[in-house]
Amino acid sequence: MSVASEMREMSVEALDDKMKALYQEAFNLRFQHATAQLENTSRIRQVRREIALIKTVIGERKAKEEV
């Protein structure tokens, strides 16, 4: 199952919780990157994309409810 389909099955509350956790992780990754302690720099991109995916799924649900 793809990440997008897994996210689409989650509730809005679960998506919000996951997004908050990802924002915290992104903050920590940026801090580690700035202090040259980050080994896996590709994780920054992965986290950014997961946040974008969650925002997209939430937006799709809001648009669907308005119709």
UniProtKB/Swiss-Prot annotation:
**Annotated GO MF terms:** structural constituent of ribosome
Keywords on record:
Ribonucleoprotein, Ribosomal protein
Q: Which GO terms describe its biological process?
A: translation
Question: What Gene3D superfamilies does UniProt report for this protein, alphabetically?
Answer: 1.10.287.310
Q: Does the UniProt entry include the keyword Ribosomal protein?
A: yes
What do the Gene Ontology cellular component annotations say? cytosolic large ribosomal subunit
Q: Does the keyword Oxidoreductase apply?
A: no
As for family, the record states: Belongs to the universal ribosomal protein uL29 family.
The identity of this protein, by name, is Large ribosomal subunit protein uL29
The gene for this chain is rpmC
